[in-house]
Regions:
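Structural alpha/beta surface segment adjacent to cysteine/selenocysteine redox centers
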Residues: 43, 51-140, 172, 206-217
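Envelope-exposed proteins and targeting segments
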Residues: 43-46, 77, 176, 183
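A short beta-strand-turn-helix
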Residues: 29-45, 73
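C-terminal cap of thioredoxin/glutaredoxin-like
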Residues: 3, 50-52, 63-66, 136-217
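Bacterial N-terminal signal peptides
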Residues: 8-23
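N-terminal secretory signal peptides that target proteins for export/translocation
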Residues: 1-7
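Boundary at the C-terminal end of the N-terminal hydrophobic targeting segment
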Residues: 24-28
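Divalent metal-coordination and catalytic microenvironments
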Residues: 47, 114, 149
Length: 217
């Protein structure tokens, strides 16, 4: 997959578009978003990550960049991070079932465990002709109830929920993965942590009346 790894920032319109043109986020149950969120609900900055579990650039971000952002911003109460499924079905045949697995895991409060396992073993399941059995084994490794998981995966509402998220992402302007909405701006690409730091520091300062300079630790 040759995803675009360029910076695309549209400050001032992105978040409005996300909330008004993508009713998915307003309609999604708070409990569903909470199970796919990290950080305090009262954090001054909210980031919506739109991602595809079969996207290699999303894997890179999840493993190389996100841990540092979590340490600096999420665990310190500055940022709330919300994961939104945006499967690129024309490129990744297993992106939809992987996304469905994550939604079902979220119902058992196991979203982030499955999130990490899907990216960790992406190179194993991505080339498979049928990834379903492997996904079930990942869910078992995450400690999920197999009975509840299978029932959720068979439920037509799970596919509808995933499709609604993808449609909402498209209406909001996302066209590649990973993509991020940061309090009014759209950022696209698995960019270096320094790019995120510059933006998050500036947005946090604007929201709290502080400075945009964070001491390096």
């Amino acid at each position: 997959m040759k995803a675009r790894c360029v910076v695309r920032v549209t400050w001032g319109a992105g978040l409005l578009l996300l909330l008004s043109s993508a009713p998915l986020y307003a309609q999604t149950a708070d409990s569903s978003l909470a199970s796919r969120s990290k950080g305090l609900p009262t954090a001054p900055v909210t980031v919506y990550e739109m991602s595809d579990f079969q996207c290699p650039y999303c894997k890179r971000f999840a493993q190389e960049t996100f841990p540092e952002l979590e340490r600096r911003y999420i665990k310190t109460g500055k940022v709330r991070w919300v994961y939104i499924n945006f499967p690129l079905t024309h490129l990744h045949p297993h992106a939809v079932p992987a996304g469905e697995l994550s939604l079902c895991a979220a119902k058992q409060k196991g979203f982030w465990r499955v999130h990490d396992l899907l990216f960790q073993y992406q190179e194993t399941w991505a080339p498979l002709k049928e990834a379903g059995p492997f996904f079930v084994s990942l869910a078992d490794s995450a400690g999920l109830s197999k009975k509840a998981l299978l029932a959720c995966l068979k439920d037509p509402e799970t596919r509808k929920s995933l499709q609604a998220e993808a449609e909402g992402a498209q209406r909001a302007g996302a066209s590649s993965t990973p993509a991020f909405y940061i309090e009014g701006g759209l950022l696209a690409g698995a960019l270096p942590v320094e790019v995120f730091r510059q933006i998050l520091d500036s947005v946090y300062a604007a929201k709290t009346g502080g400075t945009a300079v964070e001491k390096r630790r």
